[in-house]
Amino acid sequence: HGVDPEDKDGFYRMLKVYAENMAEHRQNVFRVSLELIRSSRAADGSLHLDFSEFDRWADVFWDTGRMDLLETGFVARFGEGGWSSREVLLRDFSVKDEPSGKTVRLDGKEFLPKFLPALVEHLREKKWLDKTVFHICDEPSNHNVMPWREASDFVHQCAPELRRIDAIETTHCLDRLEVWVPKLNHLSTWQNAYEEAQRRGNEMWLYTVGIFQGGSLPNKTVDVPLIDS
């Protein structure tokens, strides 16, 4: 876009263009990365958090007047092999060590119990808590749903106020997820199980895949080759 990487104001002006374009196309949910929250650790081990960039990004979208939800999170990752892995692991987080001035990586089990309650309090102060949904790990499936459940439970223990959301390829999410987001083909295959989850009070979305995948459901993917349509 011709924006100088050092021109932060220019970047946010361009982000506003994107936000307005999303709103014009009836997109009412936006995402803010947790990486925008700057973390530092004092000599006594206490964690200090700077939410200024997180807030500035979010305000660009709220200021459209047409956004309903803020998405953030993604605090876990798949093990070796990516999506096919049977492991779901809490990820590491970058933290500036104040005494040394160096950036260190903290394990999620050490970082999240301090970070998540502070995030909840900040969201509450901004009056955003009820408008926030929080990701654990993208697309857990039957072959790795058990470690995903453990990661989701860990987040819930640290911050029970956060409403959890994930794209899922499984039905085994009861008591570990508030907003379920299956693909259209999984919704079709396991419709009874998903309807039961709704009866138990879970919110149900569905999502459209960004890469072409074949199948009998025409609305499964964003783009479908004409020959297949």
Regions found by a protein language model. Name each.
Residues 179-229:
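Catalytic-core region of carbohydrate-active enzymes that cleave or remodel glycosidic bonds
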Residues 1-163, 167-178, 211-213:
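Aromatic-lined carbohydrate-binding surfaces of glycoside hydrolases
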